[in-house]
Amino acid sequence: MLKAYYNFVIDDLRNKILHRSIDLFNKEINPSRTVKNYDDFQNYINDDQLIDGAYKIGVIGWEAQKILKHAKETRHIFDGHPKSSDPSIIKVLDMFNDCIKYVLNEEYPSQIININEYIKILESSSFDRNKIAVTNAFGDLPEIYKNELIHRLFEIYIHPQTPSTLSSNIEFVSPMLWELLPKSTKINLVRKVDQEIIKGDSSITNKAFSFVKLVNATGYLSQSAREYKLSPLIEELKNNTYMWDIENRCVKELSDYAEIIPSNHIKDYVWAITHTYIGNIGHSYQYNRTDFYANIASSYIPSMFEKFNSEMIEAFIETIKTSEAIKRLVITPSKLRRLRNLALKIEDKLTNSSHENLLVTLIDEAKEKEFLQALK
């Protein structure tokens, strides 16, 4: 009787695993022979593998896993040997109740997406771009599936022959999947950027950086990856002051990395974005204005200043003190206001140290003369 009932429970467990995901079961258990159907369970999978696999893929919980292993031992003790004694009615009922509670009464688990099939769906223009649907599809995935899926999406996204529809759908789903990943998986994925840098294909490397920005993970970039990306941009920006198209492009790209500027580039970075924001004074036959600056770049720079650390504040003070261009420009009220706007963005981060007095004076409009005198 125990044997028949136990086999009935095992049958139910197999069917629930098949419903959940046989592919995931194989990945978690890694059996000697791949399980493809119900008969393969009988031929290649023992009870311990079945119970452990069911737990790992979310068919049963931790408590149920322990209870079922105890039920297996109970069955072996009392119904696995010709000389076994008969179990007490209490022992039988306890086993029945446990199996009913933890397996038979449990509803069939939700099905897990097949990664290969899901990627095929992403290739289609009919993919349902519904955030709730996507979140539900990802939320139930075990860690091993999430890890595999994010790496697959990354590899597909950076491939030069990936269709635009697939790229667009990857851009839609990846940030939602990223939020569900553990830190270790995020770090391992972002470090793939270093591997692409070494390979030397700039178009693929740029796509790798784009993916990292897409999932808001620039903070995980290695020091060498930051140097690779930011050093040329900072140098180009500094060397092309008042070249608006270049300033607009460089600042827009740098804005995504404002919190991770390498220390050895901070002085040049702060110098460049400060001068870009202040702009220049000139005349135009087309526009009735004398205050000129890169419009697009100027829309990004205030928020970049809000991410300043103490080293960047020091560089800002040094830029104001040493730049002859700024000393000349801030005599004009409009340029002084622009410089003050930048100082206001970091006002909350100022301390009472004496070397910051220059910024305190700059922020106070009543002390304009005192500030200008301090620059001489």
Model-derived features: where do they sit?
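"Short basic amphipathic alpha-helical interaction patches in structured regions
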Residues: K3-N7, I22-D23, I89-D94
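Short, hydrophobic, well-ordered secondary-structure elements
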Residues: M1-H19
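Flexible secondary-structure boundary motifs
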Residues: K16-K69, E73-T74
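Eukaryote-specific, cytoplasm-facing alpha-helical/coiled-coil scaffolding segments in long proteins
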Residues: K16, T34-D39, D79, I100-E107, ...
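Short catalytic/ligand-binding loop motif for oxyanion handling, primarily in non-cytosolic enzymes
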Residues: I10-D11, F25-N26, D86-P87
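Non-catalytic all-alpha helical scaffold/repeat segments
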Residues: I115-K376
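Charge-enriched, short contiguous segments at helix-coil
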Residues: K56-I115
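Alpha-solenoid repeat scaffolds
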Residues: N15, S85, E106, S110, ...
